């Protein structure tokens, strides 16, 4: 039986683990060969020292090797946040996913139940009538027929059950908060990823590059794990093998700046109603932040030349009813009915 103890000692001494060592350590944990105490000790040793790019990449490689995969087109993308920003905001990435799919980009959306908000992606999508526990074949069909499929993380990463109890008992952020957005079961190569703190922007962009992503924007929106219309968004963009950083304000792309209070969400039913309102073309601060994130996603997907062009395409996706049609098709296909 493999032993986690040498890796705990290495991490606790402040020594960084190589990608190979990190993968080996996570393989031990994810296969049920470590005790809850060992898992907790290892995770906190990494957290206190600060997780490195090779360690995150090794952990993701371990998760990806065990996941139940979903078949998606080569040009599919994911739009996802780490959660953990404590903002209680609307489900921006979920709504953005429908708008982007309505603009013609296949979306393989990976998500979970609430972490920092009162309603996570899975909670809100379930409230809209989507079967979040659909099997991999049904999700693949949803992506090809509706343009979007939702992959509920626990259904695809069952090995996480071995680390779940330790995470709950620790009650604080660990490396696993960073791994979900990097472990998409459809192995997409294009991502818009939101992070809960700005220090993770460049490291996660480097991890995505290390793991084979072609284009990605890692974003932090002034307290939100997405691009924001309530302040300045910081971006680390992976494009053509290079990583560059820049900032974006809503005004420079023609959007109204709002107050953080205007982006506050509620329970799943309330968030579902608000999401539907955006897709039904009701003007709101929520619509504006979705347009900003959709514009960025369309740039990442290679569908838009720049952010303003992407936002214009996002407006068209909503105004034409295409985004709402995607939602209706996903509800039908996920429940195994004709689209």
Swiss-Prot record:
UniProt GO MF annotations: anthranilate phosphoribosyltransferase activity; magnesium ion binding
Requisite cofactors: Mg(2+)
Binding site for anthranilate 2: 167
Listed GO biological process terms: L-tryptophan biosynthetic process
Pathway: Amino-acid biosynthesis; L-tryptophan biosynthesis; L-tryptophan from chorismate: step 2/5
Residues given in the record as anthranilate 1 binding sites: 81, 112
GO cellular component terms listed in the entry, alphabetical order: cytosol
Domain of life from the UniProt record: Bacteria
Entry similarity comment: Belongs to the anthranilate phosphoribosyltransferase family.
UniProt-recorded name of the protein: Anthranilate phosphoribosyltransferase
Species assigned in the record: Brucella suis (strain ATCC 23445 / NCTC 10510)
Phylogenetic classification of the source organism: Bacteria, Pseudomonadati, Pseudomonadota, Alphaproteobacteria, Hyphomicrobiales
Gene of this entry: trpD
